[in-house]
Structure formats: structure tokens, C-alpha cells
Design a protein with these regions (language model features):
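A glycine-rich beta-to-alpha transition motif near the start of alpha/beta enzyme domains, typified by
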Residues: 1-122, 163-213
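Contiguous hydrophobic segments
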Residues: 87, 132-134, 157-160
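Membrane helix-loop-helix hairpins that form the core translocation module of multi-pass transporters
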Residues: 106-109, 123-135
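Active-site-proximal beta-strand elements of phosphoester/diester hydrolases
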Residues: 127-129, 153-155, 200-202
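A short, surface-exposed loop/turn module that caps and links secondary-structure elements
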Residues: 133, 137-145
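Internal active-site segments that recognize and position negatively charged phosphoryl groups
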Residues: 142-174
Length: 213
């Protein structure tokens, strides 16, 4: 069976997108029983697959879309800001048209995506209304990080769990090691600079590991 994939990235966060409305051997994918978890693991693996941080399943029509996200390790994810923008670009490509506002239903609820600018045939600038940020309790196994109690830490939800830790030197932190200690959250480390009004951030994504975004 030949399934068409498109490969996208948002800020270096890479995703494969499958339009489940496509017809293969006379039947649309959405009507088939396909093990998408196994497909995500195989396709996202850089050794033998295309390599990506996750697999996005697209459904819907026109400016109304639905998104299902499966991480590279096969685990589900409720939401991704970069992922949803990649999904919308794939939807535009499938429809051969663009819409100024797109409604995307995710496992974290409805998200609104706005087309800011069409840069060229391969690039778009899209903004996402991510919804309210709400506080979360300290995640399970947080003590494994052995954080200094004076270090600034926030546990937050944007539909999926994030923990943000302020550090002095972002390059001195072994983020891969820390992320593997708390694999059920998205772990971000931040430090001031390089400009006075900027911060630098690195991310260890739940189910995906270190990403470029």
C-alpha cells in the first residue's frame, strides 16, 4: 500500500503529515483499519524511516480541520503549536487553496490558526491561538531532577503538560539526561539573552526527545 506523506517543519520541529482523506486502492484511509502508532514509530525513526518528531493525521475540509498527533515513540500528544501549523500547511497543499482563518479540532480542544503571510510556494507564516495557560501540580518524579529549590520553576498546561526551568547557562545543562528522568512532560530550560529583552530556550519533548524548536 502506497500512502502519501508530506514532510514539514515549524522552527525546526519536524512532522510527517498524512491526509487521511486520500484514496488508496479505491478506499479512503479514514475508512481503513491502520495501525497508526506502529506507522509513526517506523516512519519517524531516522534509521530506515523519514525521521521526524511526530506523525500528524489530518482530516476535515476547507477551513475546518482535525488533528491527531502521535509522537515519534508512538505515544499520543494532545497538542503541538508547531505541529498544528504544519498540519494547516499540509491542508492548504491538499486543498490547493489557502484560508485566512482555520479551525482545528485537537485532543486539547479547538485551536484557531491565522494565516499571516504566504512567503513562497513552500513557506507560510501562521499564528496559533494556543488558549489559556493554566498552572499544574508538580509532575510525577520531579524530584529526580534534583533542582535547587531557589531555581525558578513553573509547571503549566497549554492542553499538554510543560515544566519550565530557569538556568544560568543553557549550554551547560545536559537536557537529554534531565528530560529522560521526567519523560511524561515537555521540559523546557530557559536563560536570559542574548539580547536584553530576549530569552534562549531548549526543549526536551515528551515522546520525541530533543528537538530543534
Amino acid at each position: 500500500m502506497d500512502i502519501r506523506l508530506t514532510h514539514h517543519h515549524g522552527l525546526g520541529n519536524e512532522f510527517l503529515v498524512v491526509d487521511t482523506r486520500q484514496v488508496v486502492e479505491g478506499v479512503s484511509l479514514e475508512r481503513m483499519s491502520i495501525d497508526w502508532v506502529s506507522a509513526a514509530i517506523a516512519w519517524c525513526n531516522s534509521n530506515g524511516g523519514r525521521g521526524a518528531d511526530g506523525l500528524l493525521l489530518l482530516d476535515g475540509s476547507g477551513p475546518d480541520m482535525t488533528m491527531r498527533l502521535i509522537n515519534a515513540d508512538g505515544s499520543p500528544a494532545e497538542m503541538s503549536g508547531n505541529g498544528i501549523r504544519c498540519l494547516v500547511q499540509a491542508g492548504f497543499m491538499a486543498e490547493s487553496s489557502e484560508f485566512p482563518v482555520v479551525n482545528v479540532v485537537t485532543d486539547a480542544g479547538l485551536r484557531i490558526v491565522h494565516l499571516v503571510e504566504s512567503l513562497d510556494d513552500h513557506s507560510l507564516m501562521l499564528s496559533v491561538s494556543m488558549g489559556l495557560v493554566s498552572p499544574l501540580d508538580e509532575p510525577e518524579h520531579w524530584e529526580r531532577l534534583e533542582c535547587n529549590p531557589d531555581r525558578p520553576v513553573r509547571h503549566l498546561s497549554l492542553g499538554n503538560p510543560h515544566s519550565v526551568v530557569g538556568v544560568d547557562d543553557i549550554d551547560a545543562v545536559d537536557l537529554c539526561d534531565l528530560g529522560e528522568r521526567v519523560p511524561h512532560i515537555n521540559l523546557e530550560i530557559v536563560s536570559p539573552g542574548p539580547e536584553p529583552d530576549a530569552i534562549t530556550m531548549r526543549v526536551h519533548e515528551r515522546g520525541g526527545g530533543l528537538t530543534q524548536a
